[in-house]
Amino acid sequence: MERIARKAVKKNAVAPEPRVIALLLVVCGLSGCGIASRIRGAFEPSAEVADQGYSRDDELRLNHLQVKGTHNSYHRRPRFALVREHDYEQAPLDVQLGEYGVRAVELDIHPSSRGYEVYHLPVIDSRSTCALLIDCLGVLKRWSDSNPGHHPLFVWIEPKDELGGGDFDMDALDAEILSVWPRERLVTPALVKGGRESVREAIVEVGWPTLGEVRGRAMFMLLDRGRQRDAYLRGGKGPGALDGRVLFVHANPVDFDEPFAAVAKIDDPSSAHIAAALEKGIIVGSNVGSALLSDERNIQKLQAGLRNGVHLLTGDYPAPVKGRTYWFDMPGGSPSRCNPITAPAGCASTDVEAPGILRGRTRPAGG
């Protein structure tokens, strides 16, 4: 049995040509990538899902990607920004997906009598392009329906409760997601787990699903490092903690061997924990491109994330903005690219996703 951690760096790896990102030269690091061996898993695509036209869909897996994402993806600039870190604005979600090549988003949710509201902070930073979670989910789903050839969308959900009133109703959260995205259109813990004892065991012994098995889907992840995460796990970390659940949950570094460990948000793209996570097949997200930081510092963070194989690179600037020279456009992406650490040899960005066949040949099952 070959473990998922196994990889070999190609000899004579060649650095890609530097790419100018809004007048600043960003060298993205080595394109030479590791060869991550996988055992063919028990993930069989639904009979209703036709070939989308990608020749390596039965080989490339979900953790072979490097994806452009946005931080606080719903965010609108406050009318009066009191602090610099709030002074930015994101385009509507469908514009981010369709025009900017974003494939990973973050949504902050707050419980209310209307359902889950989506915004950053009460009063001082509360403007949003989609006021309710169900609205945001609908925007993402409609875009996906129209573009079934996309690789999975990654959606971080961060529960926020400023009053500290207790745990979220996690069953209600699952139900709200399922009211828009049916299970057959999701990458769920159950899909990854298959017949194995736990998600972790499946990732180690089988690997993530292939892209062909999960095109046109979305993958939801709970971004919480403590109480709300534990509530979603029903207070336990055993093999069955995610049974029936819709979302994966963030794994802290001390949790990387726990049965639920599959995704991790490691804010610092230079962290040594990233390499440890990649060795275990964990999908990693990091923050790059903050409104709070200088253009120079943002470039440094982006370079580190690209070079270190972070899968989901999220930031405040997915497109050029007035007053800043930094913005993030994936080097060599179409719009995503092959991960420089985990993808197999010969992987091309158009194997991951290609604009010319984004609309696919048929709609995925459950559309």
Predicted regions and their residues:
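Catalytic cores of phosphodiester-bond hydrolases, prominently lipid phosphodiesterases
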Residues: I35-G367
